[in-house]
């Protein structure tokens, strides 16, 4: 095994692909059930009303409505406010 670099070799040249994390739907936007709201590692945002959490901590809408960001007990939460039912 060579312990020195050979001619024109390098120890660099590797990088991982971006994970495309972050908020996907912002406050006030209307969403339908099942839409992804936040992609995250860990629970930076916690699920609130009408919001579910996936196995990779992704937050998604459980019902249609408008996105609302807020806090509860010092934690950032994401809620879905249902649209007014039409009569």
Curated annotation (Swiss-Prot):
Chain residue ranges for the region called Disordered: 1-25
Domain of life: Bacteria
This protein's record includes keyword Chloroplast: no
SUPFAM superfamilies: Ribosomal L27 protein-like
A molecular function (GO) term: structural constituent of ribosome
GO CC terms of this entry: cytosolic large ribosomal subunit
GO biological process: translation
Keyword Cytoplasm attributed: no
Keywords associated with the record: Ribonucleoprotein, Ribosomal protein
InterPro entries, alphabetized: Ribosomal_bL27 (IPR001684), Ribosomal_bL27_CS (IPR018261)
Comp. bias regions, Polar residues: 7-19
PANTHER family per record: LARGE RIBOSOMAL SUBUNIT PROTEIN BL27M, RIBOSOMAL PROTEIN L27
HAMAP family listed in its UniProt record: Ribosomal_bL27
NCBIfam families, per the entry: L27
Family affiliation: Belongs to the bacterial ribosomal protein bL27 family.
Official protein name in the record: Large ribosomal subunit protein bL27
Taxonomic source organism: Rhodococcus opacus (strain B4)
């Amino acid at each position: 095994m060579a312990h020195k670099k050979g001619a024109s070799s390098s120890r660099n040249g590797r990088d991982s692909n971006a994970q495309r994390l972050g908020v996907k739907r912002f406050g006030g936007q209307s969403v339908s059930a099942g839409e992804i709201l936040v992609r995250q590692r860990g629970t930076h945002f916690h699920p609130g009303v009408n919001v579910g959490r996936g196995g990779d901590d992704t937050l998604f809408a459980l019902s249609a409505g408008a996105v609302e960001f807020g806090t509860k007990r010092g934690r950032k939460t994401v809620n879905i406010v249902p649209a007014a039912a039409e009569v």
